[in-house]
């Protein structure tokens, strides 16, 4: 038996306000506000949608009413901003609305004909309601909270409103200054309310990430700019690059344009899950037609040098993806100071006769400063024609690459770090970079500098100062501490994370400093408590011990001891 209550639908809620187009004529339709929250934007799921206006964000703003107090507020959720009475609303903040307030979704101060969504607040009243999703300007209607009655629209300043012309078309569409705008049919109120709640509940971070800042829509055939790597639609950036050679986001000079295949794949996968956010066929065809980025713009360009007879050095040679055997572009020819061509390229006079006992020594090598231990095997060497070279990681100067030869002949000076395998020239012929302490040396002979103890204990300045004071009171230096630590390492008392490192291991400065810090921590850990001040030993241990990330702060470092192991949340 069917209940009499079933089948009856509850009456729609009474409207609490209405939106009027700015400059609306008498009898012109308006939008009634019935729901507690009303969303406006370009997304088709919004209560008031502008799908063809690219200057309006997908979720531009939200108008809500407090059912208890009757207060109406507007929250801006756009990327370009919402203007109320010519005052911009701060993003993610709410602004109270009053009767007669003027709302602009798109406001251009010097171009009033391009303003969109401008309107004023007006109380609700009788008259036809409009379900159009495309309006140029609108007004909202609010109830009078004092008298519970309603008054008519009273704009504050008609001269400042600058209304936009609107033409009503016979098929129900709206034509704004010649722009074709398509109206959408009114959807079921319950369906719209569910869509709005879902959209308002949690913002779509993926959509925000995949949105082009120029068109405020999902990226289409996107390209990335180098070196800043900001990404835009190819069609959107085509229009921008005709006016400027700078990046639209950071204003960095654009050196190269490249396809971003990863983002294009992400957009394609996102649209499979959200087909309602796909662009229309007309929009896609329009963007493809506006794409002015050709394939040759995506190719790397190499500057080609010409002589004065051949032409200007400003000419650029474009390289294809496939290298040609007949191409005259080759790798730059590296010449070091042991190459036979070194003097000819340096445009210096012929070398003076070498001193006796040193045949074939280039004068530049003799004059160059050196802190190397021995140059015997270096001075006798001359690079073969177009021989292999290595660039010193410290001074960036080329040297003969003899690392393979050293495996057969131990007399050849080491040229690389045993840990990071980076090339260094200090032991080969002496690094000439200003401020170099000796970028490559055996660990026991490595010069780490006088400031190597600053923050040596896990960047904890307080604990490092305790160690420095301990060494100073006993007349010890960091070299003495390193020597004692290497002896303990050899005996197995101290351990390093890289078990291959010993006192004789060839290390660069960075790898040597890292191993030195590991030994220093163990040296400090083995200092008897009786030899340290009471203020140091009386501190409680930190739960996180040596792994504490707060120990870099002076107050925390003074309060707790961090020369200990982690005791809390340790796996």
Curated annotation (Swiss-Prot):
CDD domains linked to this entry: FHA_CHFR, RING-HC_CHFR
Zinc finger regions, RING-type: 212-251
Residues with Phosphothreonine modification: 294
InterPro entries per record: CHFR_Znf-CRD, E3_ubiquitin-ligase_CHFR, FHA_dom, SMAD_FHA_dom_sf, Znf_RING, Znf_RING/FYVE/PHD, Znf_RING_CS
Residue numbers spanned by region Disordered: 1-21, 113-138, 297-325
MF (Gene Ontology): nucleotide binding; ubiquitin-protein transferase activity; zinc ion binding
Domain notes: The PBZ-type zinc finger (also named CYR) mediates non-covalent poly(ADP-ribose)-binding. Poly(ADP-ribose)-binding is dependent on the presence of zinc and is required for its function in antephase checkpoint. The FHA domain plays a key role in the anti-proliferative properties of the protein and is involved in initiating a cell cycle arrest at G2/M. The FHA domain may be required to interact with phosphorylated proteins.
Quaternary structure and partners: Interacts with HDAC1 and HDAC2. Interacts with PML (with sumoylated form of PML).
Name of the featured protein: E3 ubiquitin-protein ligase CHFR
Phylogenetic classification of the source organism: Eukaryota, Metazoa, Chordata, Craniata, Vertebrata
